[in-house]
């Protein structure tokens, strides 16, 4: 594992970044570190971080930092502080005076100048440091919150920051023992100079002198093996540029692994305690103010004892890490005009948070996040969307992660999918968790597609894996049918569905008196049905019980396809004039289409499947059913000349209109992929009159969001998103065997060629253009320099008209799908 951390030698411009971005409007791009100038003129550090293991001792972990002074004119000093810590190891009873026994925390303890022992109930370790025989200064503290906030606190988790930045030597632990350890190196490098720093974590106590030559050999061997592995994986036809992009994409994907810990029941319990304390403090201070008002006039001096007030509320029953409960703004609000008096402290300290009023309990219950997800007990290593900016899992992001991952680590890909299907993640009702901000917000049901794809990409032999997935996915399918279908109409009301601001409406919100029938939710469910059907066909080769189950899913597919394809005035989602699928806002008296050409209306196209005729031999009930459906529903069930069955939600005549729109450069087709919203809305703002008082609107925004909807951090109103482009490319490729584009004015002859063009356009975002610049970097001239030109960032989404990267910049994550586009263009899919 290897990563580059590029850090300025000047003061990090926190305040400049904060103030400049606060001053910018929604019409302006984000002001980034690279825009501040602190990285100009080579005034930065290149810090390469590498991890490797020895074959002789695979439980021993080596790390090497290679630090380069990029400044060719001046020497510079860097303070390097590798850190090791245990997660908060504080038991809820640890600070209770009445607890009969205090649990012993694990700890790290210095044993000589460059080695520390690690004492832990899962095993004992040692960590040793070396830098050409230079000894570090070992620092120790505890990984616990500072109860004093900015006032300072001995032995707390921010002690190293205070030690380095504020030169406060008293905050670290002099006994050289704690739950957090740092090894401080002060490095002085000449212009253009470099140095290597090593440390090793060993699974036993050791006072070893590091053999740096042996360590270098370990890194050289692992690098050679990694190069051999990727050389065999990548097509011979790839040039160095393609290999460079793919290697960095895989590096980002593998670095996105993170230990994620969230126990909703425990979190909710602690939150309730916090709310009670806040409520108790507020009630007492409010009552005290009322009493003081009768004795004093005007504004009375602010109390300096609010911090102690908060921490004195029955502390015996509050975990240590929960002690500081009121932030500065809340303190100021509550203490704004109160008397400086020790009487306030004594009054508040007598409040018992257990005696909470009914109103307060109702308030806590009302504000309780994820209150219906108390079964969630997540303590696992999971691939994150972006470890820097989105350090929490999102269920449909993770489905995309598995596609490139299964090429390099198939076992991990299967494990991640089974994890999401387990009972500590999936709700007892069958719903998948969305993301931690609201587990109940539905994401597109793409886990079944990912399970099927991983099964096929890993050899199509692990039927036990597929069977395990199928039975758990059955619960999720039933949840969608029972909870999100509009009656028995075959249309669905998914809500959020991961596309943030793509509509004029906030699709996460509830509109009283209305139901939003969604083209994407309905399309996803048809797609879900076909994925389950394909699994049944595979599993029926070994167990005929799946033959009957297949009938269940084909019936649902036909029902949904028929409903979606009805004209809007007849209760469906197809607009006969615009030739597009739209969401429909339904009330008791009306059905009003939201006529926006976006990815929402393209998703029904994804519901497509081709089942080989030879596979139907062992599924006789399904084979007979399909023969009958061919006569009744010829638009959705077709047979090829080879005897294969083709299932499609979008009939051929409507597919022609959709593809025409998809291929049009003034609509969806951009030089860098398929847009999320038609460019038609650049000059034609769309307006939707919700009622007499509210008119909603949107327009084409090819880069960053031009509204604050969903926080303004993402944008589905024009930019190119690799996740949806991948699904469209894959679908067009599959359809290309049986359908051709009619009409020479549409350019390409087949859907397969259109898929290839999409892949090439996506790849062009990352490749240097005729001027040697990668479109994803925009106009940043630093990337013209030798030290920068080979670096690739994997942004969340991309400006549809320029290819410039937008949003989170380490989204590998689903932007690692560029690997699949590269394979597509190499004809190795």
Annotated model-derived regions:
Residues 1-285, 289-302, 336, 355-829:
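Acidic, mature catalytic/reactive cores of soluble proteins
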Residues 294-370:
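Feature detects tandemly repeated or modular, low-complexity segments in exposed regions of proteins
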